[in-house]
């Protein structure tokens, strides 16, 4: 260390290394290197080309080549993996015609609105139909056999509902007393309504309806005795009281079919019928020919008469006799819930022709049988001949062994009429349905 406190160092010579000398390549060596590089490139290019060719070949075989199929007996080439839809589109559907679009009732809406075509896969009896919705999902197999034909007709879109099916009405004939033998019950059926056409069609019954059946029978009282019912129409009138008096004197009973309009004008006589032990029934309100009136008017004719008779006598009947006896299946369908029975007759005295008291009497006596119902009148015209004939009729019938009863008593003596009909207490069951008529 010197006086300044520093170390002194000796200078040393440092030798710098010389660069290495690279031997220079000869021309032969350079040629060998170039040849090797070129060979590599050739091999590489050949390899790449081979890959490309292999890819193209694979793509061709796998994706682009055509495969043979048979359509309608003709050979057709189709791109591999094509669907049936592709095959059809690419061949203009082989010239077949589309089906039609039909309404729910079968009318043509569009000539070409149906299935575009129909396709079956396979040959002969082994051919299977292919649904149109599977055309785009089904691949055409090499060697496949197809039959392409005209498209099927298609029914328009529609709403389907289940609707009630109204019962019909059946009417027996041949008897003097008509009544409900079987109540009707609705069934059900399928209904289609077309979305385009608006048509509504019945597509089939689900449950059959039960028809309303109207029985028609004569009363046949059982036992050894004979019974007959005298009936009087069109009252009450000024002749009614005389007839009631004769019945009372003879201790006989009859059935009176009063008109509502007549009872409204003679309420005391309507009450006198009931008070005398006779049967009060309805001849409707205004003696209209019921098959010629509408449903509402028909029901009004029946109900108004019942109301009037009840107001006059205190008794509400259910028994009617339709004017002229005209009460068809249509009238029953429209009003079966209102009445117990419609009473016709077995013996027509034709008293309205005024044939004379003797003729009226002979008609009843000559035509009488057990269970018979005889038709006479206490209103609607001059009824003096009926009044004159009545005593002889009663006496003659009794001499022949007959007991005079009301129509309800006649049915009771028969023993086979429904009790609600006999008693005038018919009520339509809650599960019953009325027929639909025009």
List where the protein language model places each region.
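Catalytic domains of cell-wall/extracellular-matrix polysaccharide-remodeling enzymes
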Residues: 242, 264-265, 288-403, 407-424
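Hydrophobic membrane-insertion alpha-helices, especially the h-region
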Residues: 43-58
